[in-house]
UniProtKB/Swiss-Prot annotation:
Belongs to the TrpA family. InterPro entries: Aldolase_TIM, RibuloseP-bd_barrel, Trp_synthase_alpha_AS, Trp_synthase_suA. The lineage of its organism: Bacteria, Pseudomonadati, Pseudomonadota, Betaproteobacteria, Burkholderiales. It comes from Leptothrix cholodnii (strain ATCC 51168 / LMG 8142 / SP-6). Gene3D superfamilies: Aldolase class I. GO terms for molecular function: tryptophan synthase activity. HAMAP family: Trp_synth_alpha. The active site is at 49 (proton acceptor), 60 (proton acceptor). Keywords: Amino-acid biosynthesis, Aromatic amino acid biosynthesis, Lyase, Tryptophan biosynthesis. Its EC number is 4.2.1.20. This is Tryptophan synthase alpha chain. Pathway: Amino-acid biosynthesis; L-tryptophan biosynthesis; L-tryptophan from chorismate: step 5/5.
């Protein structure tokens, strides 16, 4: 059983929901990411999504775009991101890490080499935003052969056919983008999310995480009531992007702990 599957199985047995924070590797300081990952895990993160910086992150709003730009300005490469995961794994061999990014860095690195090096570093899953499921079955097969979970996005505009494609090849979990548009935008319509999740579940057997638009404990709890996991990215980056170095880790950890406490008020409830 993969680390991601084991994590969701453990949480399901406890009647708890997964908390999945996202940060961009190398932001807001090049050498702070591993400390940030450890602090978030200790504060209650169940899975960590680590963004691979890219110059044209088309699905991301201005907050995550700025994070990518800051990381790239410090010359953070895909190899650097993998090295960060390897360092994290030196002292944490239980918290799953998912790399989230775009096709261009994967293609430049070389897909086969990327999979091999991701596995060696201790990565658990890979989400390539602009790899449509029907066009990347070979890559998904390669990931699974390396015991890595191919993770995919679904959106309010996703058709039943796309959901079926994702359900056929995704492992680990699927990430439902709860808003049309880019990350960090708009107001979350939790009723619309609640209506969509059963439709997704009819096509997908893995857990369903929901992200985009989750900014505080109240929205996290509302989403967690109807899903298996809450994904938070833009809000974390907003909180830390202008902090001095010594405040970045405690600010992020404090926010994660607040969300974790709120989610655990739902313990024993089922989506």
């Amino acid at each position: 059983m993969s680390r991601i599957a084991a994590t969701f199985a453990r949480l399901a047995g406890q009647g708890r929901k997964a908390l999945i924070p996202y940060v961009t590797a190398g932001d807001p300081f090049a050498d702070i990411t591993v400390d940030l990952m450890h602090a978030m895990a200790k504060a209650g993160a169940d899975v960590i999504e680590l963004g691979v910086p890219f110059s044209d992150p088309m699905a991301d709003g201005p907050v995550i775009q700025r994070a990518s730009e800051r990381a790239l300005s410090r010359n953070i490469s895909t190899a650097d991101v993998l090295a960060m995961v390897a360092r994290f794994r030196e002292t944490d061999d239980t918290t799953p890490v998912v790399l989230m990014g775009y096709a261009n860095p994967v293609e430049r690195y070389g897909p086969d080499r990327f999979v091999d090096d991701a596995r060696a570093a201790g990565v658990d899953g890979v989400l390539v935003v602009d790899y449509p499921p029907q066009e990347c079955e070979a890559f998904a097969d390669r990931l699974r052969a390396a015991d890595l979970d191919p993770i995919f996005l679904l959106a309010p505009t996703s058709t039943d056919a796309r959901m079926a494609d994702v359900g056929r090849i995704a492992t680990g979990y699927v990430y439902y983008v709860s808003l049309k548009g880019v990350t960090g935008s708009g107001n979350l319509d939790t009723d619309a999310v609640a209506r969509m999740i059963p439709r997704i579940r009819s096509h997908v057997s893995v857990p369903v995480g929901v992200g985009f638009g989750i900014r505080d404990a109240a929205t996290a709890v509302a989403v967690a009531r109807v899903s298996d996991a809450v994904v938070i990215g833009s809000r974390i980056i907003q909180l830390i992007e202008n902090e001095p170095r010594e405040r970045v880790v405690p600010v992020a950890a404090g926010f994660i702990a607040e969300i974790r406490t709120a989610l655990d008020t739902l313990q024993g409830t089922h989506a």
